[in-house]
UniProtKB/Swiss-Prot annotation:
Gene Ontology biological-process annotations: proton motive force-driven plasma membrane ATP synthesis
UniProt function note: Produces ATP from ADP in the presence of a proton gradient across the membrane. The gamma chain is believed to be important in regulating ATPase activity and the flow of protons through the CF(0) complex.
Name listed for the protein in its UniProt record: ATP synthase gamma chain
Gene Ontology CC: plasma membrane; proton-transporting ATP synthase complex
Keywords, comma-separated and alphabetical: ATP synthesis, Cell inner membrane, Cell membrane, CF(1), Hydrogen ion transport, Ion transport, Membrane, Transport
Pfam families: ATP-synt (PF00231)
Taxonomic path: Bacteria, Pseudomonadati, Thermodesulfobacteriota, Desulfovibrionia, Desulfovibrionales
SUPFAM superfamilies, sorted: ATP synthase (F1-ATPase), gamma subunit
Subcellular location: Cell inner membrane
NCBIfam families assigned to the protein according to its UniProt record, in alphabetical order: ATPsyn_F1gamma (TIGR01146), PRK13424.1 (NF009957)
Gene Ontology molecular function terms on file: ATP binding; proton-transporting ATP synthase activity, rotational mechanism
Organism encoding this protein: Nitratidesulfovibrio vulgaris (strain ATCC 29579 / DSM 644 / CCUG 34227 / NCIMB 8303 / VKM B-1760 / Hildenborough)
Annotated membrane topology: Peripheral membrane protein
Gene: atpG
Subunit structure and binding partners: F-type ATPases have 2 components, CF(1) - the catalytic core - and CF(0) - the membrane proton channel. CF(1) has five subunits: alpha(3), beta(3), gamma(1), delta(1), epsilon(1). CF(0) has three main subunits: a, b and c.
Protein family (similarity comment): Belongs to the ATPase gamma chain family.
Amino acid sequence: MPSLKDVKVKIAGVKKTKQITKAMNMVASAKLRGAQQRIERFRPYAEKFYGMLGDLASKADGSAHPLLEVRDEIKTCGIVLATSDRGLCGSFNANLISTALKLAKQKAAEGKTVKFYCVGKKGRDTIRKADFEVVTAIADQMGSFDFQLANKLGLEVINHYLTGELDEVVLVYGEFVSTAKQLPITLPILPIASEKKDEAEAAPSKEYIYEPAVEGLLAELLPRFIKVQIYRGLLDTSASEHAARMAAMDNATRSCDDMIGALTLLFNKTRQASITRDLMDIVGGAEALKG
């Protein structure tokens, strides 16, 4: 049985850990509220943008712009992977990386070359260890970013697609559903023609008057569409990270409470055993004196 001092030290250590996990839970909760507000502010713009672009895409054929063209042969696949820079958020990063690696291995099995564009340290480090090529690695920005990050990454992906370095591009990110649910999402973003036309045909008919011509607008809006998709994925991933960390720290705090309870019980049992031994020594000594 451990000594009373050892048990006291363990209890003190667990209490300090509980203070840290509780503080991290509160910080994650505050950051989650901010991330949710950013998503709510951006969502109406994104939805209107998607609707208008879908209508535009339905009025043009694949030759209207290179980003609408579906290539006959897909040789190289680019995967844009968004993860967090920090850990302590449960299985959040592991699920995203697992989804990305599963996709990469599937593409590789089809004879395609796979190239990664990673945002976040966790994804970058794991993908490099998995021996896949990391073309771009952006770190230490998931905690605080704006549209410029998506703009920079989007421009690079678009340039590589237009020059033939990539034949298709897929975005892997964490969709924020609720504080208790975050899902790894695989979203093809290039080429965009087929999916946007399908959406436009399924949507209620709307009459738009476009000036200048459709082709001119597509040249301006299609690159921005890619950037908007990436930015929305980054916003969702950021909110999902904070929600996952909040849940992980809440579970850790509860585990600390359970451990403190178990250690306190052990402390009381140890102290009781010590008192019993002392009483037995006293009684034994008294009996010896009587004898």
